[in-house]
Amino acid sequence: MLDIRQIRENPQIVQELLKRRGEYDLQPIIELDEKQRQLETERSQLQARSNQVGKQVGEKIKSGSDPKGTEIKALKEEGNKVKAKLSELEPEEKELKAKIEALLLPLPNLPSESTPIGKSEAENIEVKRWGDEYIPQNPKIIPHYEIGEKLGIMDFERGVKIAQSRFVALMGAGAALERAIIQFMLKRHIQVGYVEVMAPLLVNSQSLTATGQLPKFAEESFKCAADDLWLIPTSEVSTMNLYRDEILSAEQLPIYHCAFTPCFRREAGAYGKDTRGLIRLHQFNKVEMVKIVHPETSEEEHQKLVADAEAILQALKLPYRILELCSGDLGFSAAKCYDLEVWLPSSGTYREISSCSNVKDFQARRANIRFKERNKKGTQYVHALNGSGLAVGRTMAAILENYQQVDGSVKVPEVLQPYMGREFL
């Protein structure tokens, strides 16, 4: 959530930064904030008068005035009127705060000053390409979903029968490969300092609001309406909310977590896109990296986060590129973001496999996650970062295509062979 104080003090700057992302009008928020501050001033004045009246009553009684006399009676009547007015202001203030929050919640994060300005993905900037030497030269590579079905390791037809379109059943070596990928990713992240988390797959509305999925992406999520519970679209949600409404010590930072979970998305805006294969499913597995850090280190931590995602792709020897996203293509909560895209030879394109975002204090404000430094007054909001490390289904798709052999078999990447106990599928 954006800082109302920043909007109040620098409305033109905030409006200009928001314009880099789209059309957003701050004027209704500014007007409501002005009303709220006027009410706060009035409440402070009334509270001061109430305290003054109470003090005067006490002093007069102490000096010998008749507690039932007209002077004391008049003061008490005034005090009661002031208290009544204060009581009237309370719901009005509460309503104004709720209205301001309702207008703030749909606003995206402000893009970082270093984020390239642009309107769409066409203006993203490629900053790195790796692994061209690993691009397969086999001219007969077929899509991952075709080789998966030929090998008997993917069953889309039964996935549809069990659920609906955009579901798959992995069989035999397919299930084993998925599990091997997950184990390898988690082990690697843990080795470099991430602490594994297994948190709920069902979360409440407050949790989704804290990380920015609600209210904007309600239509993209699966909801259990009777219980006010939602299936998570990413484990970033449950991992970040471990610390919701907490004050950490500066010594606890940085916090690194990794988590494997199934993720669930309705893909409401993806009609007709990637209708076959593992690229866009309603249920998919993902290993997520989450960092909670000191604001002064978040930019450095962002680069490390990208490197941790890269390390998985490099270990698997999967060709990829990195894009720096422009302001118009940023995710809702991101201030700065790099997308890692893996090479899929059957289509001759790079496809997103990880999105590494620095959300700065945007989620921390919504989730009320702060930290306190020793010998310093007050608290600060933490900075948060998240990134896929990696999307498991897309990793499998990339392996099935990049490691496809001329004879129709698929070689298991060397780093996964100890988990699989085999060299080929």
From Swiss-Prot:
E.C. number: 6.1.1.11
Binding positions (L-serine): 234-236, 288, 388
- Signal sequence span is none
Q: Where on this chain does ATP bind?
A: 265-267, 352-355
Record region (Disordered): 41-70
Task: Give the Gene Ontology MF terms in alphabetical order.
Answer: ATP binding; serine-tRNA ligase activity
Main subcellular location of this protein, as a coarse class: cytoplasm
Looking at the record's lineage, which domain of life comes first? Bacteria
Q: In which pathway does it act?
A: Aminoacyl-tRNA biosynthesis; selenocysteinyl-tRNA(Sec) biosynthesis; L-seryl-tRNA(Sec) from L-serine and tRNA(Sec): step 1/1
Does the keyword Aminoacyl-tRNA synthetase feature in the UniProt annotation? yes
Show the CDD domains listed in the entry. Answer: SerRS_core
Q: Which reaction does it catalyse?
A: tRNA(Ser) + L-serine + ATP = L-seryl-tRNA(Ser) + AMP + diphosphate + H(+); tRNA(Sec) + L-serine + ATP = L-seryl-tRNA(Sec) + AMP + diphosphate + H(+)
Bias category Polar residues: which stretches? 44-54
| Alphabetical GO biological process terms | selenocysteine biosynthetic process; seryl-tRNA aminoacylation
For this chain, the family text in UniProt reads:
Belongs to the class-II aminoacyl-tRNA synthetase family. Type-1 seryl-tRNA synthetase subfamily.
What's the stated role of this polypeptide? Answer: Catalyzes the attachment of serine to tRNA(Ser). Is also able to aminoacylate tRNA(Sec) with serine, to form the misacylated tRNA L-seryl-tRNA(Sec), which will be further converted into selenocysteinyl-tRNA(Sec).
The annotated subunit structure for this chain is: Homodimer. The tRNA molecule binds across the dimer.
Q: What is known of its domains?
A: Consists of two distinct domains, a catalytic core and a N-terminal extension that is involved in tRNA binding.
The name this protein carries in UniProt is: Serine--tRNA ligase
Which species does the entry assign this protein to? Trichodesmium erythraeum (strain IMS101)
